[in-house]
Amino acid sequence: FLPLLFGAISHLL
């Protein structure tokens, strides 16, 4: 589920 978390962070950034 790491990629999903990174995706969320990227969206916030």
Curated annotation (Swiss-Prot):
Modification Leucine amide, positions: L13
Gene Ontology CC, one term: extracellular region
Subcellular localization, as worded in the UniProt entry: Secreted
Main location: secreted
UniProt KW keywords: Amidation, Amphibian defense peptide, Antibiotic, Antimicrobial, Secreted
GO biological process: defense response to bacterium
Tissue: Expressed by the skin glands.
S-S pairs: none
Family that this chain belongs to: Belongs to the frog skin active peptide (FSAP) family. Temporin subfamily.
Function: Antimicrobial peptide. Active against the Gram-positive bacteria S.aureus FDA209P (MIC=44.3 ug/ml) and B.subtilis ATCC 6633 (MIC>64 ug/ml), but not active against the Gram-negative bacterium E.coli or the fungus C.albicans.
Name listed for the protein in its UniProt record: Temporin-GH
Source species of the chain: Sylvirana guentheri
Organism lineage: Eukaryota, Metazoa, Chordata, Craniata, Vertebrata
